[in-house]
Amino acid sequence: STGRTVANNLNEQLAMKEVMSNPLENATKVPLKNGMTDPRWLGTDGWVKMQRVIPTSDGNITIHFNYNEITGVFDDFKFK
């Protein structure tokens, strides 16, 4: 598992809250060479890796998450 789930500062807390409240707004798919292979989120079951980049005065905050294009479910939000 790469990335972390705990915010280091207020900007990160606010960015995570924003992303979790509306994950697909300005989100893009993260290209994966072999697709989603983690057994918890298999690409064959509809899962894709997504990211949002939130600009702040201190630089960008990037958050990755998993999205199931079939069910519309989101999971595994992490700071990158």
Residue ranges of model-derived segments:
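Catalytic toxin/effector domains delivered as secreted proteins or via bacterial secretion systems
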Residues: 1-80
